[in-house]
Every structure is written in structure tokens, then in C-alpha cells.
Amino acid sequence: MPTAAIDGIATKYEVIGSGPPILMYAPGGFDATADKWRTQGVYAKIKLLDYLPQHYTCVVFDRRECGASGGRVERIGWQHYVAHGKALLDHLGFEKAHIMGGCMGCCPTAAWGVMHPDRVLSMVLYWPVGGAKYRMSSHQRFAEHLAFVQQNGAKLGLQAVVDLVTKEGKSFGADPRGGPWASVLKHDAAFAAAYVAQDVERYKQLVVGLGRTLVDRDTAPGAEPEDMLRCDIPAFIVPGNDAAHATSAARYLHECLPRSEYWDVPVADQTEANTPARLLDFLAKADASAASRGG
């Protein structure tokens, strides 16, 4: 996978196939790497990257702060993930694209629709995260990281984070103690040195705010309902059904997005035999709609 400086952040990405572009925000929560489209859970089963590239240019990437991509210590919101993806499309020369998200990737996908509707051909939201259990577990994740920093003291707390990540090599999703920048700390020594040099109290305040505002509701985060209700972009929603991907979160998005289609198929019946074809049908209709509108 090539690397480019995208929005000032070193970004690993890959372009697969040909046709209209699809920017694909990977599943995997806080470990959203391009390979998850092939290796994780339902995505390994439905094999979208065996089918979509036959008709579309699929842009897959390690999201900022994930995998081999870099990051920046700041109070990250969904708008930052949108800016990262937008800069990647700009780098590749794509003016408009379908935006697809899996899992937590649905949040910036929904945000795209309200922030840059003129650049979005359609939105695909596969297993959107959300629900009361998701909010609770997400806040617990940030709390565990903050507790680890606190337990190691003001002088050693951030160094302890770097030491842990260097030794264990786990992402924030795998071990909350390593925090939201664990993946970058693992492979970027200069970033790690700057991370340790921060004021630890200011850092803790930043993390508290990040966790509270990133996952701020008991349904699908990413965009405000009032903004989505005014969104005139075709959307395709596929529900999950577990503690991180409550079916209610998918239903909420369907309620809020006026031009959305809700594929009411149980998780067990989402297979390679039916899912890629259904998704390609939706994308073809969205392309036809955009063409008729002169998009």
C-alpha cells in the first residue's frame, strides 16, 4: 500500500478496481485498517472487495490513528475523519464519490452527507455502531486509558503508555490502556517522543472531551438528526445486531435519512450470495440518479 501525506497525516491507502470512486471507511472501531474489509467478521464473509472493484474504483485506507497511518494529538471529532477522507479524495483527483462505512466508519460517512453533500454520490452504512451498550463500552474504554495514565503518575503516565504499546503492540481497540494514539506510538518514534513531552493534565482533559463528544448518544453518532433530515442523498443501510451495532442505530439512520433504503435482512442471511449484488444494484441506481441530475 502506498503512503501519502493526507491532511498533514501520513496515510496508508490502496486504490482497487476501476469505475466511479467509492471512499471506504473501514470497520474495526479504533483499529480501522484497510485489511478489515477482507478479514473481519461479516466483511470476510460477504467479500465486497471481490466484487465492487469490478465496477468501481475502491479507495481503502488505514484511518488516521489506525494501522500504519499517522495521527495528531487533538480533540478528534467526526469532522476530522471527514477531513481526512476528503483530503485523500483530493489527493487522488476525485471530485465526487460514493462514501461507504462499515461499523464505526458509518459515523464519518453520515457526517459526509451533511458536511459535503455536493461531493457525495451516495452513502452506504453497513452495520452502523450505536446503542446504549455501545456508548457505555466506548466511554469505559476512554476511562480505562485515563486510569492507566493516572495510576502511573504525572511524570511517568505518558511514558508508561508508550512503554506499554511498545511492549504489547496492541491498538486502542485491543487494549484500552494504550489510548487513542496507540497505533501511531507503535511505529513512529518521533510522534512518541512528542507525545511523552506533553503536559499530562492538559492531555487528560483532551481525552475526557474526546470520549464524551465522539460517542455522545445512545444511537448512531456522527451527524445531527436535524441535519440528516435535510439530506437529499441516496443511502443504503444494512443493520447489525450486537452490543456494538444495535439494530436500533440502523433504524434511527433510516428514520433520519429521507432517501435511505433499509435492507431488512438478518445478520445470518447477509452472505456473499446476496449482499454484493444488492449493494451493486443500489450503487447503480445512485449513479443513474446522479446522472439524471447532472451530477
Protein language model regions, located:
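Conserved HGGG/HGGXW glycine-rich cap/lid loop of the alpha/beta-hydrolase fold
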Residues: 6-70
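Short beta-strand/loop motif that positions the catalytic acidic residue
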Residues: 230-231, 237-239
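Gly/Ala-rich beta-loop-alpha elbow adjacent to hydrolase catalytic centers
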Residues: 101-105, 109
